[in-house]
Amino acid sequence: VGKIKDRHALTCRNCYEFSHKHQLGKPEKERLRIEDRLLEDVRTYISENLGKPPVFKPVVHNAKATDHEMVLCLSDTHYPEVVSPDETMGLTYDAEVCARRLERIRDVVVRYKDLREPAYPIRKLSVALLGDMLSGNIHEELEITNQFPVSEALVRLAQLLHTMASSFAEEFPAVELVFMPGNHPRLTKKPRHKAKWNNWDYVLGHFVSALSRETYTVQVPKDLVYVHEVCHRRLGLVHGDGVKSASFAGIPWYGMRSRREAIQSLLRHLGQPAIDYLLMGHFHQLLYWQGTDCDLIINGAVKGGDEYSIDTRHASTDPVQALLTFHPKYGVTDLSRINLKEVT
């Protein structure tokens, strides 16, 4: 029976096991033979390869680190909307909460920069403001319940964003803000495709630009899709309301995939370079969706849940914003979630 002779009684716990082992059938005998061969092969391999160098090469510490850039996705503050905790199972939001959350975002971004700079320098921060920064008056209930009228809200929010950008300018070698218009601050009840930039978010961007006094750069494009370059990568910026969904704050997967493929096809048709990333807000949920030639990044909302999401979907998502880190060769190397849930 092969090497069964080597399995003497000392390896058995009692006589019953010994006799049982020596009365095994053919399948069990074959299993024992295979086990013996396997053990012998393992012993042989270890004895022959003991002391050989490891498969991995030693870690190489580069003396010179590569410059990186950061992109803060900032969207859907809906300033100065008021969310009543009495109606939303404790959710709360207003202009003061928004200000504290913006301050928290500022602190976290600078903290991440300080933590990473011992490993690699951060040469620039881009802030992609992806729309719906102002609550606007397109819905009658918002016009009635907003904490301030839209004109006053615009002035107050511009001051907050200027303070944030000025703080960033003290920490980063270069800071650039890009303002994209959302759907809530539009000037008409019905959405329009012509002159979509005719929007309170557009005015907000120019207001902040006037306050900047060239301490940081501000872009306020009229483009329906604005292309912003970061570390030799092309980022397409939109608000996202053009992607139709069955209900607000749902994720229309098919529509998003179609939009991502369509923009690449359009750029090729126009003889322009393709984009590497498509960034949008609007859906109030943070999402990174990798694609073949273009990754889709959806930002969360500073506001979080409200009466509408609770009443229509019995749902609320945490207020989260995205901070991206880019490498010149590898593109996005990190996505950090800035969770603002505890800031009330």
Q: Over which residues does each language-model region extend?
A:
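Divalent metal-coordination and catalytic microenvironments
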Residues: 76, 132, 161, 182, ...
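Conserved beta-sheet core of the metallophosphoesterase superfamily
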Residues: 169, 196-202, 206-224, 231-236, ...
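N-terminal active-site segment of His-dependent metallophosphoesterases
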Residues: 20-163
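Structural motif
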Residues: 69-71, 124-126, 176, 233-235, ...
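A short acidic (Asp/Glu
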Residues: 83-84, 136-142, 179, 187-193, ...
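Short helix-terminating capping/connector loops at secondary-structure junctions
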Residues: 116-124, 169-175, 272-273
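Extended active-site neighborhood of metal-dependent phosphoesterases/phosphodiesterases
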Residues: 52-63, 144-177, 181, 185-232
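BZIP DNA-binding basic region
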Residues: 1-19
